[in-house]
Amino acid sequence: MKEIKNIIIKIERFQSKKLKFFKENLMENKKNSVIERFAKKGVFPYQFALTLLIPIRNIFLSPQKLIERLELKEGDNVLEVGAGPGYFSLKVAKFLKNGRLTLADIQQEMLDIAKKRLAKRKVSNSEYYLCNGTKFEIEDNKFDVIYMVTVLGEIENQKEYIGEFYRMLKPNGILSISEQGGDPDKMSVEEIEELLKDFNFEFYKLYGTKNNFTI
């Protein structure tokens, strides 16, 4: 009950920021394509970035719960793919007291928002990487953990990306994929398993339900 009250309070504080955000980014932007992309499949438009920071998301998957599922260690080197405005990034970076978090996204505007958000909270162990949609210009065996939340379905060349994840992970590294109901790009557990079968990943754990899960 206390957690629900806290969420309600945070949502109330969120409202004024949200109204200002929509006025600046949507009311002045008359392009229907941006609004259409909000509810359709594909890359989530940065113009709606603030909606990804709404506290009610904690009900489905909080940053703290994700950290537990990732089994992170304080010294890990971690890559977040599709970081967006940094909803999960802030707490993950703070947890990595002796490690580093690289935030990757295909939209520079999203990275700019995340960078500003983390800098405001004095986070200094983060890096930012703009994806080009194909290869990652990152060395082999760099990361202990690579994770993404409601992102995989947005990627067009999924197998190429999975191959890149495998290359960038250290031996015995973890690739974590989370999906949530209501996302138009949501993939099922079975679809993800089918996608991964051509690579040398071993299934480790399934958290949550088939509608909202982390593997």
Question: Which ranges hold each PLM region?
Answer:
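Class I SAM-dependent methyltransferase Rossmann-like catalytic core
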Residues: 38-60
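Conserved alpha-helix/loop element of class I SAM-dependent methyltransferases that forms part
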Residues: 57-75
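Class I SAM-dependent methyltransferase SAM/SAH-binding core
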Residues: 79-81, 85-135
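Helix-to-beta-strand junctions that scaffold the AdoMet/dcAdoMet cofactor pocket
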Residues: 96-97, 155-156, 169-171
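A short acidic, Gly/Pro-enriched loop at the edge of an enzyme's catalytic core
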Residues: 134-146
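A short SAM/SAH-binding and catalytic strip from SAM-dependent methyltransferases
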Residues: 144-157
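A short glycine-rich, Lys/Arg-flanked "PGG" loop and its adjoining helix->strand segment in the class I
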Residues: 159-174
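Conserved class I S-adenosyl-L-methionine
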Residues: 176-199
